[in-house]
Amino acid sequence: MSEELSKKHTNRLNKLQKRLRREVGSAIADYNMIEDGDKIMCCLSGGKDSYAMLDILMNLQQRAPIQFEIIAVNLDQKQPGFPEHVLPAYLEKLNVPYHILEKDTYSIVKDKIPEGKTTCSLCSRLRRGTLYGFAQRIGATKIALGHHRDDIIETLFLNMFFGGKMKAMPPKLLSDDGANVVIRPLAYCREKDLEEYANLKEFPIIPCNLCGSQENLKRAAVKDMLNQWDRQYPGRIETIFTAMQNTAPSQGVDREQFDFVSLTRDPDAPMRGDVAEANLPAFDFLDIANSGRIDLDAAKRIDIVNTYEV
């Protein structure tokens, strides 16, 4: 690598590193992900996202005003051809405590899922159960997963399109049994930034080949849709994620999230003006200085010229 290219490489890495650290720091602060004395079990798959998460958390650990412990954990699911030496060598080079777990979930998945069908759901459930149990065993107070902003948005659309639910991946989650807290420090990070960061840092990526033809998965189709939107309408993905953080249950249709049944009007509420607001055409009385709300003083000045009552 020439000196000029090396300088560009370093400058780009530094810029990207600062952005990712800032985004991770913001997510941690916004959701109170890490507290003083925490023991963080950082789950590594060997993919770009989990490598980046560990790298950034280790850097923040050195700078944070609080003390917390990081333990890296990888689950070897006994996939054929899995390079068992890669992660131990990398983690020992970093001098980070780690555990490599072994559980043959590969055989279970292949036995239970017909050929050609998506294995991700069962695979993730088996993996989650193993990691949850091990976290309790070592006394981990938080389990850190490497899901990023794109994963969260994709999951929302997957659940909308194929599950009929407005449900995504929360940045912080309490397990159903209450025994584990899951955190996603990369919740504010873009996948393309993490991919570039992994390339610049030259992480020893281990590809997942268990699922076979990944491009046939529903998630890949949703990802393509979102990528197309991002190209055609820059800023749309950011707006979607912002909207996910600004929900209004009273403006939706989910009866579990808001008690519509008990909604009643207050007959004693004071009336503002001679004419009820609901009877006024909003566009006639918009007060620009009042955030687009109806100018009730103007409404009050209307003369009622005709009334018919039965």
UniProtKB/Swiss-Prot annotation:
Annotated residues for binding of [4Fe-4S] cluster: 120, 123, 211
This protein's pathway: tRNA modification
Cofactor (UniProt): Mg(2+); [4Fe-4S] cluster
Keyword Protein biosynthesis: no
Localization: Cytoplasm
One Pfam family cited in the UniProt record for this chain: ATP_bind_3
Family named by the database record: Belongs to the TtcA family.
Motif PP-loop motif location, chain numbering: 45-50
Gene that encodes it: ttcA1
Protein's organism: Shewanella baltica (strain OS155 / ATCC BAA-1091)
Chief location category: cytoplasm
Any one biological process term the GO annotation gives: tRNA thio-modification
Keywords in alphabetical order: 4Fe-4S, ATP-binding, Cytoplasm, Iron, Iron-sulfur, Magnesium, Metal-binding, Nucleotide-binding, Plasmid, RNA-binding, Transferase, tRNA processing, tRNA-binding
Note on how the cofactor is bound: Binds 1 [4Fe-4S] cluster per subunit. The cluster is chelated by three Cys residues, the fourth Fe has a free coordination site that may bind a sulfur atom transferred from the persulfide of IscS.
GO molecular function: 4 iron, 4 sulfur cluster binding; ATP binding; magnesium ion binding; sulfurtransferase activity; tRNA binding
Additional detail: The thiolation reaction likely consists of two steps: a first activation step by ATP to form an adenylated intermediate of the target base of tRNA, and a second nucleophilic substitution step of the sulfur (S) atom supplied by the hydrosulfide attached to the Fe-S cluster.
Catalytic activity from the UniProt record: cytidine(32) in tRNA + S-sulfanyl-L-cysteinyl-[cysteine desulfurase] + AH2 + ATP = 2-thiocytidine(32) in tRNA + L-cysteinyl-[cysteine desulfurase] + A + AMP + diphosphate + H(+)
Signal peptide, first to last residue: none
GO cellular component, one term: cytoplasm
InterPro entries listed in its UniProt record: Rossmann-like_a/b/a_fold, TilS/TtcA_N, tRNA_Cyd_32_2_STrfase, tRNA_thiolation_TtcA_Ctu1
Subunit comment: Homodimer.
Summary of the function given for this chain in its UniProt record: Catalyzes the ATP-dependent 2-thiolation of cytidine in position 32 of tRNA, to form 2-thiocytidine (s(2)C32). The sulfur atoms are provided by the cysteine/cysteine desulfurase (IscS) system.
Protein name as annotated: tRNA-cytidine(32) 2-sulfurtransferase
Top-level class of the enzyme under EC nomenclature: transferase
EC number from the UniProt entry: 2.8.1.-
